[in-house]
Curated annotation (Swiss-Prot):
It comes from the Eukaryota. Disulfide bonds: none annotated. Removal of H(2)O(2), oxidation of toxic reductants, biosynthesis and degradation of lignin, suberization, auxin catabolism, response to environmental stresses such as wounding, pathogen attack and oxidative stress. These functions might be dependent on each isozyme/isoform in each plant tissue. Belongs to the peroxidase family. Classical plant (class III) peroxidase subfamily. Keywords: Calcium, Heme, Hydrogen peroxide, Iron, Metal-binding, Oxidoreductase, Peroxidase, Secreted. Its cofactor is heme b; Ca(2+). One of its GO terms (molecular function) is lactoperoxidase activity. Binds 1 heme b (iron(II)-protoporphyrin IX) group per subunit. Binds 2 calcium ions per subunit. It comes from Vitis vinifera (Grape). One of its GO terms (cellular component) is extracellular region. The lineage of its organism: Eukaryota, Viridiplantae, Streptophyta, Embryophyta, Tracheophyta. This is Peroxidase 6.
Amino acid sequence: MGNISPLTGTNGEIR
């Protein structure tokens, strides 16, 4: 959490 990911936006987790 708190990670910048292009896939999940700014979540960093794929749920």
